[in-house]
Amino acid sequence: MATTRVYLHTLGCPKNRVDSEVMLGTLTGAGYRLERDPAQADVIVVNTCGFIESAKEESVDAIVELAGMKQEGRCKKLVVTGCLVQRHAEELSAELPEVDHFLGTGAYAEIARVVSDAQAKRLVVPDPDFVHSAATPRVNSLPSHTAYLKISEGCDNACAFCIIPKLRGAQRSRPVDDVVAEAAALAAQGTVELSLVAQDLTAYGYDLPGKVRLHHLLPELCKVDGIRWLRLHYAYPRDVPDALVEVIAREPKIVKYLDMPLQHSSDRLLRSMKRGRDSVFLRELLARLRARVPGIALRTSLIVGLPGETEEDFEDLVRFVEEQRFERLGVFEFSPEDGTPAADMAEQVPDVVKRARRDRIMALQQEISREHQRAMVGRRLEVLVEGRAEETEHLLAGRHAQQAPEIDGITYVNDGVAYPGELVTVEITDASEYDLVGHVVARDPERARRPLPAPAGGETPRRGGLPVVG
């Protein structure tokens, strides 16, 4: 009997990617085979995002496009999961008759049963209380040397613009030993870089017994053999104690990079957003991080066009960006989401104004980024090699410690030999606004002694540069 083939399409954030990987693990554990081509899949799963309007539109477009595989391919069953389902299950069910099943964020563990059971309900949307554990099957969908590690699920904040608590439920932190066990399992599969994610990373542990917090978890993760880089994403600024800053500064495995969504700098807007901290607190926190963790790269995200955002508020934000000179920065245009207080606030900002404000901040950040990048020229950086560059086979592509996967720039290597997943020392010779260029100047001696090419069945080493010689 032929094995049923499954294709899974993921939209949204890294946390959604982890959910997809858990579903893939559940499906492969039940005997299904993963398929990269949707036209060849018997079952198609779409894991959606429902955070803002543009994400919802992208999710619906993907569902409609992949539904065509029922006529054009071999697909017999289409399943839609994730945040959009948790939020709009009844509406989606009525508008998308071609979808066989809808699973909410609390039903990921049910995916194999729903796919296999001809009598399964069409809508499976329990309360959003699922959280995976180290024992939960999971298939890493990134190259084996890097992975996301979700340390908690849900969020207890009440930001006026955000729908996430309704989609993901209350915060549920995973026990320290469970998180460490999953990290060790990933390391055993060849992972050297772990990116920690959560809806609110710095709130980790307050719901666990024993007053466990993030600064208790991190040293335990640093003890995991094989893990070389740990990076922190989605660090809510409200709760960054000195103990956490000290751990970041002290532990060499924790890369000097922190992703911290600040959203705005105007005190009036921070109050209306219910962010819980004012601009004085934010500035003091950023100064403390810069002083205690020399060389740290700070990434943030901002929202422009919030209800009531005046020109004065926006100019305050421009000055804040100019003053703080973040190494990495992204900007979202405010999206009014039904069910959030901000959606019903007066003084909604026109879309054309939002777009202009976003463009102005990003143009400013491009100049700041160019300044940071140029300062890298001449430095020697540890770079994690990913493989051949997408643009040309004559370059290797990698990332240094302050370039996160999927969201930041790339370090291109134009001369030298390295294996995918290898950490090498690269001297930077050129820079653009977001990317760097350099050549390998040092490798781990054990790696460097391995022959080129590798023995049959082993890794294939990669050479950057033109011409390619071997």
Swiss-Prot record:
One of its GO terms (biological process) is tRNA modification. [4Fe-4S] cluster 2 binds at residues 155, 159, 162. Binds 2 [4Fe-4S] clusters. One cluster is coordinated with 3 cysteines and an exchangeable S-adenosyl-L-methionine. One of its GO terms (molecular function) is 4 iron, 4 sulfur cluster binding. Residues 447-470 are annotated as: Disordered. NCBIfam families: 30S ribosomal protein S12 methylthiotransferase RimO, MiaB/RimO family radical SAM methylthiotransferase. This is Ribosomal protein uS12 methylthiotransferase RimO.
